[in-house]
């Protein structure tokens, strides 16, 4: 980790949480999760607090490791991680038929990496919906630097209660974000409401697959690790997600777990048995260096108390993701394209 990289990471740790409150925020966040004895009901009923704490605590680590787009991707042999991430975003825009001048909504947009890429790729106007103040502040600055403030903006709101009029958007997408929703039907109904009739919604969902066995202790541990390290109330099955879209009123055009035929495993950047210079910060060695540096920064007071514990639960998530991917019980890219009927 370079000195500038270390300082950039340290300066953002904790997001909008004050430096003195980071440790207690970590305590509260961890207690929500099954890995520490927390209950699914508490995670769902307190999802706004849980998810906001998660992204305040984790965003700087994400940006340091992933760049501006916090998601996995279907990947071809010979393709870099960055190239695959961009193509994964372009695929959504193409499936939605996004064209110049269209109004598009990115649900759960993070710091806006995908919305900036899709806006530049399609020449559409993209609004990012996010309920985390720190991520929106960071995203607006990145929009300014990229010169896209005229076509890309952010709205701070809960995707379960969107502040938009009915039939506002020409297209809506979500990239590994609606997995945070406590109720998928309620979330998809809001998306349905703000989408214009005859237009489409495309999504990459985090899901457990048909290979997941709920009574298998190893499978349950992996699921708990992923939920802990990624701020999730519960990981739903692919069937549950697709049925939720139908229950919200959508017509299904097509669906597929894109991880099934990805020539390069989606979890490769996190796999301790592999090494890649192109994604070094995500590798086991890279993460170990980051963890050591965060510990040192915390020790000398440049990073808030509790930062090392955030690094630790993100490391636990990485282990769960790799194991879940190898056992084929988890996918971060269950894709479906659905349409709002022209006449309801």
Curated annotation (Swiss-Prot):
Pathways involved: Steroid biosynthesis; sterol biosynthesis
GO cellular component, one term: endoplasmic reticulum
InterPro entries xrefs: Erg6_SMT_methyltransf, Methyltransf_11, MeTrfase_SMT, SAM-dependent_MTases_sf, Sterol_MeTrfase_C
CDD domains assigned: AdoMet_MTases (cd02440)
EC number: 2.1.1.41
Keyword S-adenosyl-L-methionine: yes
A Pfam family of this chain: Sterol_MT_C
Alphabetical keyword list: Lipid biosynthesis, Lipid metabolism, Methyltransferase, S-adenosyl-L-methionine, Steroid biosynthesis, Steroid metabolism, Sterol biosynthesis, Sterol metabolism, Transferase
Biological-process GO terms, alphabetical: methylation; sterol biosynthetic process
GO molecular function term, any single one: sterol 24-C-methyltransferase activity
Similarity remark: Belongs to the class I-like SAM-binding methyltransferase superfamily. Erg6/SMT family.
PANTHER family, A to Z: HYPOTHETICAL LOC100005854 (PTHR44068:SF1), ZGC:194242 (PTHR44068)
Name of the protein: Cycloartenol-C-24-methyltransferase 1
């Amino acid at each position: 980790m370079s000195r500038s990289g270390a300082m950039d990471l340290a300066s953002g740790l904790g997001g909008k949480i004050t430096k003195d409150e980071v440790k207690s925020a970590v305590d509260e966040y961890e207690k929500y999760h099954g890995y520490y004895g927390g209950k699914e009901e508490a995670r769902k009923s307190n999802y706004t607090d849980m998810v906001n704490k998660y992204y305040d605590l984790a965003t700087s680590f994400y940006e340091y490791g992933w760049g501006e787009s916090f998601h996995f991707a279907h990947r071809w042999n010979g393709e870099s991680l960055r190239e695959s991430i961009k193509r994964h975003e372009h695929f959504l825009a193409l499936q939605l038929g996004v064209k110049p001048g269209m109004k598009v909504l990115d649900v759960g947009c993070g710091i806006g990496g995908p919305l900036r890429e899709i806006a530049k790729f399609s020449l559409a106007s993209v609004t990012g919906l996010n309920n985390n103040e720190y991520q929106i502040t960071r995203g607006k600055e990145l929009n300014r630097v990229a010169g896209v403030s005229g076509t890309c903006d952010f709205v701070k709101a809960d995707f379960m209660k969107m502040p938009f009029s009915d039939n506002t958007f020409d297209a809506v997408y979500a990239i590994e974000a609606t997995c945070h929703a406590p109720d998928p039907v309620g979330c998809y109904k809001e998306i349905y409401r703000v989408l214009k009739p005859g237009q489409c919604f495309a999504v990459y969902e985090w899901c457990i697959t048909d290979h997941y066995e709920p009574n298998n202790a190893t499978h349950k541990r992996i699921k708990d690790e992923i939920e802990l390290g990624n701020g999730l109330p519960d990981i739903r099955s692919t069937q549950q997600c697709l049925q939720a879209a139908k229950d919200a009123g959508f017509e299904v055009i097509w669906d597929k777990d894109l991880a099934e035929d990805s020539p390069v495993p989606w979890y490769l950047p996190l796999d301790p048995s592999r090494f890649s210079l192109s994604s070094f910060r995500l590798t086991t060695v890279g993460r170990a260096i980051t963890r050591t540096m965060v510990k040192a920064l915390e020790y000398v007071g440049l990073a808030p108390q509790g930062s090392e514990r955030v690094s630790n639960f993100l490391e636990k998530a990485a282990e769960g993701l790799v194991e879940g991917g190898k056992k084929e019980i988890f996918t971060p890219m269950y894709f479906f394209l659905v349409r709002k009927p022209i006449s309801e």
